[in-house]
């Protein structure tokens, strides 16, 4: 399972011109699911991201987590994180999980974050979405459960 975590001041996701998810400040998480991923991977990522200390404390050191700053998560499914660009100019996405597994683990990830007390807004799994955000820092962190 792969995640791109971006610290943001604000973010929203729209589908066909309708805003379906919005946050004030926190993380935008782009989440990709691989074919061998399990719920243990989604739990692991939710735990890591909920405790990720990349918000500034009073002396300016990145030392605070989402809960410390009242942060939220905008969670977006992103199968393109599994793009293979080795051959040609058109990426292959055969490394991504099938949609049923991807949706199940995306929902499990969001549920785990909520169970950890993190407010979560979401896009629509498999939807054609437009995501806008104001990057803060910028701070962008990559996670891959294959490297844990």
UniProtKB/Swiss-Prot annotation:
Catalytic activity: glycyl-tRNA(Ala) + H2O = tRNA(Ala) + glycine + H(+); a D-aminoacyl-tRNA + H2O = a tRNA + a D-alpha-amino acid + H(+)
Top-level lineage group: Bacteria
A GO molecular-function annotation: tRNA binding
E.C. no: 3.1.1.96
Motif range (Gly-cisPro motif, important for rejection of L-amino acids): 137-138
Subcellular location field: Cytoplasm
InterPro entries reported for this sequence: Daa-tRNA_deacyls_DTD, DTD-like_sf
Entry keyword annotation includes Cytoplasm: yes
Subunit relationships: Homodimer.
Family that this chain belongs to: Belongs to the DTD family.
Protein name in the entry: D-aminoacyl-tRNA deacylase
